[in-house]
Amino acid sequence: MDKQNVPVITLDGPSASGKGTIARLVSQALGFHYLDSGALYRLVALAAMKRNTDVSDEHSMVDIARHLNVSFRDSSIWLEGKDVSDEVRAEACGEYASRIAQYSALRVELLGYQRDFRKSPGLVTDGRDMGSVIFPDATLKIYLTASEEERALRRHKQLMEKGINASIADLIQALRARDERDSSRSTSPLQQCEDACLLDTTGLSIDQVVSRVLNMYAEARKA
């Protein structure tokens, strides 16, 4: 199958909107490949941290990305042959990832890498510019969001499960700062595409959201 004919579902949205969990489950339901684009920036950030490289050095971040040795195996993420699934989800790693994601040269470097994930029978991907920049011809584009309180509660639950204490108020402030940074960057800012379907997951269970996405995809395939 020609790559351009391979179906793609993109789920974009702010941090802690649930897009990663939903994208992974939808990909499993459809038997599609899965790309966690945010993990790529986290992996670059993690690699920089491990090498004690200054993340404010854009050239160094591009060089790290160019030689990045990563793989996604089921629900685990590997860097240089080591399972870094937990490390890459650490709050510090996420903060650094948000900073380096503003580097236009880095985004260009990772562009082709991400598009190479488009393989038969299909791809489900989540991020912040998947529908607007990486896969503008996607079969279905969804902008996933939720209230600040709901997103903070989800992040709090994730942290508590890892034994990390955090206050809801602090998490809301952190999410606001992250949203501002992601939405105001000059290159590929976080925004809803004109042709993306808005899906507010506030008050919905994971199963309900997955079901809605699958129904939306079925309708998109008919069009």
Swiss-Prot record:
GO terms for molecular function: ATP binding; CMP kinase activity; dCMP kinase activity. Keywords: ATP-binding, Cytoplasm, Kinase, Nucleotide-binding, Transferase. The keyword 4Fe-4S does not apply. ATP binds at residues 13-21. GO terms for cellular component: cytosol. Its EC number is 2.7.4.25. The lineage of its organism: Bacteria, Pseudomonadati, Pseudomonadota, Betaproteobacteria, Nitrosomonadales. Transmembrane segments: none annotated. It holds the Pfam family Cytidylate_kin. It catalyses: CMP + ATP = CDP + ADP; dCMP + ATP = dCDP + ADP. Belongs to the cytidylate kinase family. Type 1 subfamily. GO terms for biological process: nucleobase-containing small molecule interconversion; pyrimidine nucleotide metabolic process. CDD domains: CMPK (cd02020). It comes from the Bacteria. The keyword Cytoplasm applies. This is Cytidylate kinase. It comes from Nitrosomonas europaea (strain ATCC 19718 / CIP 103999 / KCTC 2705 / NBRC 14298). It is an enzyme of class 2 (transferase). It is found in: Cytoplasm.
